[in-house]
Amino acid sequence: WSVDGVNFTRNATNPIFAPKAGDWNCGRAIDAEVIFAKGKYFLYYATRTPDYVKQIVGVATAPAGTNFNRETWTEACDRAILVPEWPWEETCIEAPSVVEMNGTLYMFYAGAYNNRPQQIGLATSTDGIHWRKVSNKPFLANGDPGAWNYCESGHPHIFKDKDGQTYLFYQGNEDFGRTWFLSQRKIIWRDGFPQLK
């Protein structure tokens, strides 16, 4: 936790959450993001199938007023909430980032591993647990040959500022990971749907 956003103190109960290894996951959690919505906290994370073949997304929840300690988080369901299914996603869904707009949750996620190329997809939910992918194509694709993001547009983070404007931050590179760049795109909302400006 931090009071100034610069200096942080580690939670004494770290790790505050680890999924229970079993039929659907290997017991690890990475790329975590927490959002408060629907009267509770959601912790979205990437994990892998028990055979470590596919990267998938899971979710845990904690009640409003939580101190974020380990004992407050519980797995919200006994399955992955998002899995790779389209050709461009290959065997990986990771780096979920969620924003709520007018009661609907929008998840921006990375599909495929770094430099495959990784691209950004979009899914929606009304309860934070059951998700539907918006399209079988990326929301934000990698760039053309020679572009700064030719090898990937990945690991998204959706950010809403105090004025309500949303921005999609993401990483990219053109040389298969030897150098990395960060960028952002402004998101505009039309008929309740995000679009790149």
Regions found by a protein language model. Give the residues of each.
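Carbohydrate-active catalytic/glycan-binding domains of CAZyme proteins
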Residues: W1-K197
